[in-house]
Amino acid sequence: MGSNPTPSASVLYMDLSFILKRVKGITLNSKEVKKGYLFFAIKGTRFDGHNFIREAEERGAYAVVVERPVSSKVPVIIVEDTRKALGKSAHEFFGKPSERLNVIGITGTNGKTTTTHLIEKILLEAGEKTGLIGTIYYRLGEKILGSGRTTPDQITWHRTLKEFYELGAKNVVAEISSHALDQYRVYPTRFEAVLFTNLSQDHLDYHKTMEDYFASKAKLFTEYESKVKIINADDTYGKRLLKITHGEIITYGKKGDLKILNFRTDFRGSALRIAFKGKEYEFSTNLIGDFQAYNLSAAIAYALWKGIEPDLIQRALKCVNVPGRFEVVHSDKFTVIIDYAHTPDAVENVLRTARKLSKGKLISVFGAGGNRDREKRPLMGKAAEKYSDLIILTSDNPRDEEPEKIIEDILDGISEKDKVIIEADRRKAIKKAIDMAKEGDMVAILGKGHEDYQEIKGVKYPFSDAQVVKEILGGDGCIGKD
């Protein structure tokens, strides 16, 4: 971009397009400001960027974008919403990349990661280079471009889309979190398709109420352009979404446009029979779990809408690996399941399937994240009690909270306290579960899935459930990468 000298300080109300042609970069982090950069003052949950304008000036900011009048030595551009202004500016600064790509956005409480991987696999099978943005990583083929938040900030989002485009991608499939929608992190992306999986309790530490949570999710369907909207018609909030969204809509579920006729699952995988536009199709996959019926249906609905042949869809679904999602570890006598389930609904879904597949007892090991929604903790305990013969409560990512206090919150939802063992050390808890497992039993380790760290008091220590299980089982364990 241009290298014009910084103009004299003034308060401006103008189209940011004029300024964007004259700056070298844009940022919302005052510590990243360089000479000639445009700084956006964002008011966050912990910090207010308006308090860091002086630092941005000292680092050479060309101008600052704010929501309220401030004293500054550089031009001040006042806008109604700096988050939206940042999104629009990043979109323009990086060449409007979403207009050159087919961007598929997926939102919902559970199923986002699996559904993004399914759609990515289908598009790759169709010969279309496809990027993925999500909880585990941001990647294009084998190239990992980054990781962090499920959905990155506005600058990272639009810059990543640009990188995908420059690397030859035709499509990008992305998880869109409720936080991202509330904070306009993907604004003003033009989507090819947007998908809704489901909504159940999570993130109430941030959204406060389920109504606020739903309102954030709904933004993807009411405030963004998309060619098609694909919605779970069996979900209560999905039905509500149908009443407020417009344009081309495809529903999926037992009563959807894409109708689930039959689904069966066991340790060999799953089979799904559906009806869509007067035709019946059957698909099989290595993925396990009753909940996969909806993840598969969402991905198939998109693929059929796009005109991808059913035979090609089947080839893609035959073997899918989603790290930390119902990951099966086989030993000589029993089975271990590793899953990211960290909401009441996800815990119930995973343990219901585990109960169904287990020939013996079901031992569950889990905790809950610190500094997050406390209300869901007893509900997770209640869900675990419903299906488990034995529950070992332990730490997840306690963050700044004491693990014992989190465990107490979970314990409040469990009535049969005699089926509970408390072991705050997660490694010891996993070992205890494996040591107690007998032939035919199943051990379900929930909450962290693919994560390779445990966050305690601001420090992320190396920790992987899969690695710990492998170390404990030694040569007896085989982690399936189905």
Curated annotation (Swiss-Prot):
A motif (Meso-diaminopimelate recognition motif) lies at residues 396-399. The modification N6-carboxylysine is found at residue 217. GO terms for cellular component: cytoplasm. Carboxylation is probably crucial for Mg(2+) binding and, consequently, for the gamma-phosphate positioning of ATP. It is found in: Cytoplasm. PANTHER family: MUR LIGASE FAMILY MEMBER, UDP-N-ACETYLMURAMOYL-L-ALANYL-D-GLUTAMATE--2,6-DIAMINOPIMELATE LIGASE MURE HOMOLOG, CHLOROPLASTIC. This is UDP-N-acetylmuramoyl-L-alanyl-D-glutamate--2,6-diaminopimelate ligase. It comes from Aquifex aeolicus (strain VF5). The gene is murE.
